[in-house]
Amino acid sequence: MKRAIVFVWLLLLCGPHLDAQQDTPPPFPTQPKPSAAASAPAPAIVPVPVTPPRPNGKIQNSLVRITVTEEEPDYKAPWNAGAIQRGVGAGFVIDGSRIMTNAHVVSNSRYITVEREGDPNKYRATVLFVAHDCDLALITVSAPGFFKNMTPLKFGGIPELESTVSAYGYPIGGERMSVTAGIVSRIDFQLYTHSSIDQHLAIQISAQINPGNSGGPVMQNGKVIGVAFQGYSGDVAQGVAYMVPTPVIRRFLKDIADGHYNGYVDLAITYSKLQNPAQRKFLGLKDDDRGVLITTVVAAGPCAGVLREGDVLLAMDDHPIASDSNVELEGERVEFPEVVERKFKGDKVKLNIRRDKQPMTVTVQLNAVWPYLIQGHRYDVRPRYVVYGGLLFQPLNLDLIDAYQPTDLRIRHFFDYFVVEQIYLEHPDVIVLTNILPDPINTYLTAYRGGIVDEINGKKIHTLEDLAKTFSETSDRFVVKMIGEGPPLVLDPKQVEAARERIKMRYNVMKEQNLEEQPAAKTAQDQNKI
């Protein structure tokens, strides 16, 4: 295509000149011919293009290209190493000889290298901190002198709507830096797809963000105002991309200041807006467009025993909550959970509420809430499982749902309503019989696949550890009752033991169980102490 374009361009330049020669009458014969030197036209003066200004400076001295080799867990055969994959992202240098990028760029990583502009070498990098709940990470390079000629970038604030921004990175795996420009289109709460459960402040921009841009800085007036992290494909929406804004970035950096990332805290409540006049009148509320109705208080959350269903939440830390659930922060209207988003584990928040038509003020000490973890993706961990008699038992979570795509409505209900219906109070782990490794000792058991374990030999099974411990006990038989109707599954321990090595060798089961990351306690109240 390049050659064709140049050829047409030359034709356009030459075309008018040829036409002019044909229209001009021939010179008189008596007129002497001018010399070649005299007849040569004066050279045209072609203006030299002026290099456009760089509003953000020379970013090449701050940007790096990150190449990651990762191992994705295999939830269908969790004893095996998963598939090896390779990905490319971007990062940028900040103070303290650190490189900021996205968590999804370095998740499940086994080997990381970074490259600098103008340097042919690849440098080994290691992860310092990773925050999967807000899709941010810090890595570093230990090679001497790596950061010597690199310029740490500074952070700015929240940009104005319709203001211009520039996104930097290495889209589609390119080896040279790319820059795209766009405007700020929206400032709102958005789902962070890396975890698939966390919602934080995010800024929508029209600059093109493609694979390889992830982790790169989005800049304005020489300062970082966000980190590019997700967007829609062209089939869904055009020119819709998102960046992690600086309030989220600053919270992450403050959280890790003590050398440990605690993660986001949460009120662990659900609520409904109070915009209907009749509903407001029924609740005895003023016609002032304030307040939201508390509909659920999670027993494992910090509001348990403080808030009740039916309370009306009017203000948070003296920020009035509108009936559409928004508050005003830094001149912007955002969802009221943003007030809590900026707090940390152990911080307190003051709540103005209305209970039984009476005003009250209460205080809540904030903490992380473990039941939500089942509905989010897990990274940098090995899947938990138990294999017994060729039966594979695993705790229910989002990664398991993605791997097996179950159609059983009972499994979907336990997953979807795990928090809202507080299923975790009885089942901190929802143990599913996900697969059967065929062997003579487990024939005719296919109908039990997808079942949720309720009890074994009359003993309630609450966690994966309970299941493993029960199977290790001495018994003539194990009677496994699933949730719902139907006959129990029965296993003969002697037959299971006789087939143990045979099954391990046949299916390359190197390890029969992995119990890591189980809930640390049995009660919801104790579980909240994390």
State where each predicted segment sits.
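A short, Trp-centered hydrophobic/proline-enriched beta-strand micro-motif
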Residues: 58-76, 167
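Conserved active-site neighborhood of the chymotrypsin/trypsin-like protease fold
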Residues: 72-73, 95-177, 211, 359-361, ...
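C-terminal recognition in membrane/secretory proteostasis and scaffolding
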Residues: 21-45, 54, 61, 71, ...
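A conserved glycine-rich beta-strand in the N-terminal activation segment of trypsin-fold
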Residues: 47-54, 73-96, 102, 121-124, ...
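Gly/Ser-rich catalytic serine loop of serine hydrolases
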Residues: 82-92, 151-156, 172, 198, ...
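Bacterial N-terminal signal peptides
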Residues: 5-16
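Active-site loop architecture of trypsin-fold serine endopeptidases
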Residues: 109-111, 147-150, 168-181, 191-215, ...
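Generic structural signal for buried aliphatic residues
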Residues: 99, 112, 159, 165, ...
